[in-house]
Amino acid sequence: MKSLVKTAKGPGNIEVRESPVPKIPKDDWVLIKVMAAGVCGTDLHIWHDQFPYWPPVILGHEFAGEIAEVGSAVRRYKPSDRVVSEPHSKSCGVCHLCRQGIVQLCKEKRSPGWGMDGGFAEYVTMPEMLLHRIPDGMSYDIAALAEPMAIAVHHVTERSKIECQDFVLVTGAGPIGIMAAFVAKAAGAAKVVITGLDSCEAVRFPAARKLGADVVVNVQKEDACAIVMDMTDGKGADVVIETSGSQNAISQSIRMARVCGRVCVIGIPGPDETPVPWKAAVQKSLVMEFCMSSGYTAWDKALSLMAGANKDLSSLITHVEPLENWEYLFGELTAERGIKGLFLPKE
């Protein structure tokens, strides 16, 4: 089968290879025929050697497909079922986090695409416990957005707990930021403002508007803080969702939140340590949530939300390519000339 492989440590070292179709490793696992697979920022970081991985490994953890084969202990799924999968494979199941259902943060976890072979291939294996059915009528392309959408749902609704009539600010107009704006609006936010850069003007800002952002702000041309304060009569945002990882955006998130507001941090900064206006956060009595990945409940909610917005979400998919065009697609997404790129491994 065709596959996109990170062959060795170091920048680059990615190539399309012929790999054997994987065998089901355990009785409660399934073999999935991959129909569409999304490119994540993590894949780009692995390309540049900026994220942990165990080569040689097939990349990709955002995928949708059809079950080709099931293990003898699989009970809820059968061949031909359409599924997506959470990426939290190889969690230990016995640590204090796993026992609380927080398998995504288990230290033993080795997700597809970096810790085990992933979905940038014609086939991938996953455990039954991580599967979710694709709703009837939803295309594989849209279903491949489930993983980042689940992250947005988990952080925006389950952690930030957005309430009806909240004023929500999203910093960063990347895929997660745009999805966070979409989820916030669906959760009842009265106003959603999203910030971005010059590079967002052509594609990302129009998609954000289409998916629910009331106002877009180019921070290279406008003063986001002044705009937010003007729109809220000087109070600030009820909820700030920080998705960019930018040092300036992290600082501004605290300054633009209202007293007793909520700040949800999703974006991961480059440096290990990032200065923040801690005094301002304390004086405002802010609630700050630091979030990583997503859980089972968020996936169910995300798929339900996506099923009701199937057509709207197509604006997020700006590139669709075969695996052979990986370098072009990675370059386009790195340059922010798109939002979500998909591979169709069978083409």
Model-derived features with residue positions:
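Glycine-rich beta-strand-centered segment in the early N-terminal region that forms part
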Residues: 22-37, 48-96, 130, 135-137
